[in-house]
Amino acid sequence: MTQSNPNEQSVELNRTSLYWGLLLIFVLAVLFSNYFFN
């Protein structure tokens, strides 16, 4: 049960990377929408 801490850290890292990925996709979507509207 001593290896539960590294697992939790890896889960937190995956969540942060997932949030950054969603943010990047959102920014790209906004840029593409601006190109389409222009």
UniProtKB/Swiss-Prot annotation:
GO terms for biological process: photosynthesis. Its main location: plastid. Keywords: Chloroplast, Membrane, Photosynthesis, Photosystem II, Plastid, Reaction center, Thylakoid, Transmembrane, Transmembrane helix. It is a single-pass membrane protein. One of its GO terms (cellular component) is thylakoid. It holds the Pfam family PsbL. It is found in: Plastid, Chloroplast thylakoid membrane. The chain crosses the membrane at residues 17-37. InterPro entries: PSII_PsbL, PSII_PsbL_sf. One of the components of the core complex of photosystem II (PSII). PSII is a light-driven water:plastoquinone oxidoreductase that uses light energy to abstract electrons from H(2)O, generating O(2) and a proton gradient subsequently used for ATP formation. It consists of a core antenna complex that captures photons, and an electron transfer chain that converts photonic excitation into a charge separation. This subunit is found at the monomer-monomer interface and is required for correct PSII assembly and/or dimerization. Belongs to the PsbL family. PSII is composed of 1 copy each of membrane proteins PsbA, PsbB, PsbC, PsbD, PsbE, PsbF, PsbH, PsbI, PsbJ, PsbK, PsbL, PsbM, PsbT, PsbX, PsbY, PsbZ, Psb30/Ycf12, at least 3 peripheral proteins of the oxygen-evolving complex and a large number of cofactors. It forms dimeric complexes. NCBIfam families: PRK00753.1 (NF001972). This is Photosystem II reaction center protein L. It comes from Arabidopsis thaliana.
